[in-house]
Amino acid sequence: MSNKFVVIDLETTGNLPKKGDKIIQFGAVVIENGIITERYSSLINPQKSIPAFIEELTGINDEMVKDAPLFAEITEKVISLLDGAYFVAHNVLFDLSFLQEELIQAGLEGFYGSVLDTVEMARFLFPTADGYKLTDLAEKENLQHDRPHQADSDAQVTAELFLILLERLSSLPLVTLRQLTHLSGGLKSDLQQMLGEIMANKDMNTEELPDAIEIYRNLALKKLTPLVDNKEADKIDFQYPSKEEEKIEVVNQGFEFFEKRTGQFRMMDTVYQAFQNDKHTLIEAGTGVGKSLGYLLPAACFSKQTKVPIVVSTHTIQLQEQLLKKEIPLLEKILPFKINSVLLKGRSHYLSLEKFSQTLMDENDNYDSTLTKMQILVWLTETETGDKDELNLSSGGFIYWNKIKNEAPIFSQKDMWQEKDFYQKAKRDAQAADIIITNHSLLLSDIKGEGSILPAFDYVILDEGHHLEKVASQFFGHSLDYLSARLMIGQFGLYEQKQLFYEMEGLLAAIPRQKGKLLHTFELNQMVIDLTYEMDEFFKLIAVYAKAKQTNKKGFNRIKVRFSHGDSGKERNALVHSAERVAFLLKDLHSAIIDRLESIKTAKGTLTAAKENKLEELYIFGAELAELRNTVIKCFLKESKDVKWIEMDTRSPQNITTFLAQPAFVADQLKEKFFQVKKAVVITSATLTVNHSYSYIMKELGLNADATVQQSIPSPFEYKNQVQLFIPEDLPAINSVSLDEYVIAITEHIITIAEATKGRMLLLFTAYDMLKKTYELIKESGFLNEYVLIAQGITSGSRTRLTRNFQRYDKAILLGTSSFWEGVDIPGEDLSCLVIVRLPFSSPEEPLTEAKCQIISEQGGNAFSEYSLPEAILRFKQGFGRLIRTEKDRGLMIVFDRRIVTTKYGKAFLKSIPSVPVKNGTINELVELIHSWL
């Protein structure tokens, strides 16, 4: 193997060398025997103008390159650098394609040596990294990266990253390296020779495995540490600290500088009493109360004293991770006993080692499957949970995960991986746990009586409890979407596509045939063709129905259309007939597959482990097919009280639609199946009350006011001194103008405000279409070119990634919709200005909103005051909560929607947030306020 690596980075005028794009900067770092021995960089004259966006990205302009050499003038140097070396780059095919083109144009041979891609290597060697951009990886590994998108800086950082990747590769167990080598032929990177040398080195020096690693059935795994159930053995001489001075003494041990929070102590007592007295309890705790510790401390004390588990359920993964990794360790510092805690998820979140080990033998892999297998091989040396949420999977990786996820076996089989199984370990740990952390959906699966991972429990804390009603509605409902249905049928495939169908026929061919009973392969193949066609037509007809019934003519691209059983139009009739045909074909295909599987099963004793696993996979596919048919019938062919609707983007191909069915209200189900069977449920959130009353949330959840404790704990922050609320007078009333006119008016204000605040601004929208139009208009205006605009749904990345990027830049503006109204935590000066573009009422055309309002009106109620207004107020409170995250923050909140002061109900919004100074005025007065306040 060559011990010389040349790490190259290029800046270019665009992405297409064959279409005339050129190199404008060349950077190279040479590594020999693990040490950087040379650096070389040069600007290049591209002999064409550098586009404005490239200049903005790289900082390189026409003036800087006009006297630089042509690429042809540095080819001799480039060739000497690459002589006998590996070509290494971050996304190697991009840099290589430009280099080849330039070398060929200079009359030379291209580079035909070995290549290594650091993106690809990082994907499998850092399987849990947040992202694989160079900036993300540099941040992860604490590498100095001051000048991204400059070739010399990028090449240096890529070289440092490459050395770290080599070190990680060398540290892997020999058995893992052998498996990676076997798979590496399917990659872009030429890894085999290098892996061979690393393995030879390990062979020669007789490998010593780290203590934390074990080899089991030819897989290197991290040793798992089971939770030890000490409930019966524990003799804890510790009482709950009921007095304030006792709490101070206990909590003080966890903090270097402890500041007493009276609200937090009140919360502790309320939670402890709820469990002691078996009382359902609602606690609204304002920002800064210290909610997590406020419920965890009494929960831990109660659990230890009574030897019963407490289930803590949250809505977001982010909060679950925070509880497990930050709050529980803090709790263990301040309490004199060990707390057994476990994070539980649904079964399909856990890897099946049995299935994974079998798929390692499959030969017909695509690129994504190969890379995901390599990712998982490395991850198995690190993970203690086998939870897929730890992994950063590609979209193709998620498809592969479906083959290896943990599922209940359809027919009994001997599982040789039982003692190492991640799901079984999670179940065992749950039995030993004092505190079980989970999510609302898994909590509800316990209600539904689905084989839950949760042990028996009577005491629950629901954090982010305002989400429970929405999660329950989704949980008790059904959904059908084109991509999932198509993917499922695609997994089975046609015979010639060599997917599950082909593999099933292979199993069948190996056993004696039962004459006349089974369909011919050709007939089954035709059935799959018919079903695929009918499924396409079915989803096209869903789209036709949606477009025909669409009443929203405001130019929105994303539409939601209610599907009514009372409708007798031709579009509905065509759709129902299509659903009947799909259900019929699904039934036939399911029966034909099960007949075949039952035949194969008769020879079960003669099947190898691999064939038995394939049979299991086929049975699971059959169950999924039956479930799909069941959903089609429930959604289209059976009368039900569920609200049914269609969601689609009018710009997408016409069959890419989603059909949903959900109950309008879930209060009765929650009351009967949850609140009446649990001894004490504590529901907490920063947003439970409307106008200081809990009646709305209690009605939504089916709670009895007389039997429920209600406790409000205000935030310790001094909002009067920390926040100013401003309402511009010179904007049009939102319902008096068209969407486009309103967007033009607010965009002018946004530009003026941004220039005054120097960015540091979060804009909250209620609809994506308005966000998109505003973003495009700001961009077109050119007034904010020096600001970084980050927009949900436009800028790529998760909410966490977008928030992090917003905090990274001095002059940044973040535009968000639904999920940004809550759960975004941007403390300090990073966020100084919050703009609420319109009051967050759900559209009356939103199917669930329309159905709820209809039912309330039919029952003689007032839909606006009983549902639409309280729901909007809770969302408004969540939005307000984004601005002030610590006692030192200061900020300005601007509400563009003048209904907050021009309508009677507007006052209810202002009453529901802490008391702050409210000012009305023109944009000029607002700018003056910004300068004096911020």
Predicted regions and their residues:
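A contiguous, basic/glycine-rich beta-loop/short-helix subdomain that forms a polymer-engagement track
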Residues: 408-431, 444, 450-451, 586-731, ...
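Conserved non-catalytic scaffold segment of RNase H-like nuclease domains
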Residues: 1-114, 127-149
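Signature of the SF2 helicase/ATPase Hel1-core->accessory helical subdomain module
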Residues: 321, 409-435, 439-584, 688-700
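Acidic two-metal-ion nuclease catalytic site recognized across multiple nuclease folds
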Residues: 1-2, 164-244
